[in-house]
């Protein structure tokens, strides 16, 4: 809605002003932050600062545009509800965090979309778009001092406001499932709690890369290549300010679900016992190459710098991040798996979920006595 007009720009003018500079203007929302951004030529960076400041501070939320956007979001909510993997992730978040805000879908419940009015959006912006919550990041061929001065001019009058004070969620775990008509596969999300971004330790990212990054990883080499249980599978360490999740996702034929879960738990237990030196070297190099590659991409550099500022209050130098990767030992990676298994699994099943599948899954992911 912020792109639907400001006090000084109507909706078409926002698009025209950006496109006249050859720039992209957009936004995205994650569980713990919203980002408004522009991408274009470095010589126009100051223009981008002032345009984003206008959008963030002076959006008018026209009633007619709100009605149209509401219909778009309601349609999107239907599509999310009909998608088995999206459904599995929503169930997984609820299994992890219960009713905490961290467990809620970014799009929100349908009732909120139908209920929210212009006054609600105005109050939300006044509460959240304040100096204590905003970071401004620029990357690329720019003059940092000049951009810093422009940021002060454009955003300097923002009231400081109140910082966010959200209690971290308490991990629960357990099994959630939902049968979706018309699905031929079972979509699963299996995971465990890990530390959030404020714990500046890459051991959990290394653990995820050891377990499931690349075709030579245990997840893919064993479940896909050797046993043929899955076509698609992946593993990530998703870290937010307040919490984190070690996440394994896969799509499997319903009659292979039990075997898939059994083998997954065996692989996790094996990693908890020991991490092979070659697997650690592979994971370390994969993360280092990703870090170096992202450093050559201004958009990724901006996003990572903003997340660093929110979680740590500083931007981590590249050499420091590489040194931290090198400092994690094989025992340190195995310790991540040990802590996760001790916490207990959270599992979500969606799509083709047969009779008794959730009960069998609950027994299969239960830690061994």
Write out the residue ranges for each language-model feature.
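Catalytic and ligand-binding motifs that coordinate phosphates/metal ions
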Residues: 172
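Active/ligand-binding-proximal structured segments within catalytic/core domains
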Residues: 1-18, 199-211, 219-225
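Charge-rich, well-structured scaffold segments of protease-associated domains
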Residues: 10-169, 179-181, 194-195, 212-215, ...
């Amino acid at each position: 809605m912020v792109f639907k007009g400001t006090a000084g720009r109507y909706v078409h003018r926002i698009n025209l002003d950006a496109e006249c500079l050859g720039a992209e203007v957009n936004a995205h929302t994650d569980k713990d932050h919203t980002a408004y951004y522009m991408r274009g030529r470095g010589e126009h960076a100051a223009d981008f600062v002032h345009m984003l400041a206008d959008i963030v501070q002076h959006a008018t939320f026209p009633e007619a545009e709100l009605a149209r956007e509401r219909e778009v979001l309601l349609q999107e909510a239907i599509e999310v509800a009909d998608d088995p993997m999206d459904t599995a992730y929503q169930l997984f978040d609820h299994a992890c965090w219960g009713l905490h805000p961290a467990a809620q879908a970014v799009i929100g419940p349908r009732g909120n979309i139908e209920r929210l009015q212009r006054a609600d959006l105005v109050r939300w912006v006044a509460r959240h778009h304040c100096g204590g919550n905003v970071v401004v990041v620029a990357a690329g061929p720019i003059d940092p001092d000049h951009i810093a001065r422009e940021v002060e001019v454009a955003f300097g009058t923002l009231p400081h406001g109140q910082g966010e004070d959200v209690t971290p969620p308490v991990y629960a775990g357990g099994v959630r499932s939902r049968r979706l008509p018309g699905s031929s596969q079972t979509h699963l999300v299996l995971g465990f709690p890990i530390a959030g971004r404020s714990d500046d330790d890459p051991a959990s990212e290394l653990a995820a890369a050891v377990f499931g990054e690349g075709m030579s990883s245990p997840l893919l080499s064993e479940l896909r290549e050797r046993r043929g249980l899955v076509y698609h599978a992946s593993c990530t360490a998703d870290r937010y300010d307040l919490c984190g999740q070690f996440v394994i996702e896969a799509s499997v034929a319903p009659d292979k679900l039990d075997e898939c879960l059994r083998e997954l738990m065996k692989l996790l237990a094996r990693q908890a016992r020991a991490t092979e030196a070659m697997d650690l070297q592979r994971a370390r190099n994969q993360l280092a190459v990703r870090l170096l590659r992202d450093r050559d991409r201004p958009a990724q550099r901006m996003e990572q710098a903003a997340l660093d500022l929110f979680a740590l209050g500083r931007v981590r130098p590249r050499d420091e991040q590489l040194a931290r990767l090198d400092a994690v030992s094989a025992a340190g990676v195995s310790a991540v798996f040990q802590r996760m298994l001790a916490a207990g699994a959270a599992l979500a099943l969606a799509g083709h979920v047969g009779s008794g599948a959730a009960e069998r899954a609950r027994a299969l992911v239960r830690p061994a006595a």
